[in-house]
Amino acid sequence: MKNGALFIKVALLFCFMTGCSFMNEQQEISKPATTLIQSQLTSEGQDLNNRMLIIGTGDMTGVYFSLGQRLSNMYEKYNGAVSGTQVTDASIENTELVSRHRAEIGFTSVDVLDLPETDKSKLRALTALYSNYVQIVSTKQNDIDSLDDLVGKRISVGTAGSGTRLIAERILLESDLPTDQLNLSYLSFSQSAEALRNGTIDAAFFSSGIPNNEIAFISKQTELTFIPIPGDIIERLQKQYGVYTYNEIPRDTYRGMKKNVQTISIKNVLVTYKEMSDPHAYNLVKTLYEHLPELQHAHPAASDISITEATKQVPLDFHPGAVNYFTEQGIIGNQ
């Protein structure tokens, strides 16, 4: 498991050994302790009571993390799960963690699911979520208004295990810019924002729900430029991959924006591993939708989550437990 921060809401081992109650604090768990806890608590049962539930998220300033934290709280509150969130590099790493049973559920963008390194046979979808918007950001002083202006510039394209890096590299490849004249760095959302602020990079890619917290913060400090994705590049990406949608970043998303910005969006999905029991998966989905307003309160991007869209635009087999829930709700027919 990645040596990132693993947040657990209770002191797991102590309380399970002694039956005590404990203060509700976030606690970092080392790899050996996490492995021990999982071996003791993740046997599948009829519900989530006292089950260890790790959620793969992303950068601590991103939407995945905000929603993961809220989901964790919901599963503890309504299902009695012992739940926590894992800070990761996001989509690509999350699919790896879930497929290896190092996390029970994880957030990912659908374009990651068809990568050669993604073993779809080990993964199952629980529900479609909201969409990520590709946001290519610079500061006004850099005079970068188009993709062509990125030649010779310092650009952050996201961390190695992120969907941001995947789509950034695909866009740059389709732009036909000379790769030897692009100075790329691989920074998280928070690192990219800080580097834009202090001038150590000239532009950064962010693929996230809107508004992105880091972009919103720096837009209050300096005037930003949002670089549009040309229509011909969008068309080629749609034709080649089939998972990208033409969209626009509304002009009221961030301070200082004067017009909508043409871009692409990518659907997000919540995934689990194939071996999760049907009742367990059913309860995960049921709790999410029965208490959806609580999740939507965690970040504005979650306002786009809708049960009527829960099974759309997901190139992955759904878990039978999720299918059972959506069938009960009349979203899909009997399967």
PLM feature spans:
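Pocket-lining segment of extracytoplasmic ligand-binding domains
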Residues: 109-113, 119-120, 142-143, 179-271, ...
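An extracytoplasmic/periplasmic, membrane-proximal ligand-sensing/linker region
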Residues: 50-53, 187, 191, 198, ...
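Bilobed "Venus flytrap"/periplasmic-binding protein-like clamshell domains
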Residues: 50-78, 83, 133-198, 312, ...
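Ligand-binding clefts/hinges and TM-proximal coupling segments of bilobed small-molecule sensing domains
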Residues: 160-175, 243-317
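N-terminal (or domain-start) structured segment
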Residues: 37-107, 115
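C-terminal motif of bacterial Sec signal peptides marking the signal peptidase cleavage site
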Residues: 18-19
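Short beta-strand-centered segments that line the small-molecule binding cleft or hinge
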Residues: 103-106, 122-128
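Immediate post-signal peptide segment of exported/extracytoplasmic ligand-binding proteins
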Residues: 25-55, 117-119, 143-154, 320, ...
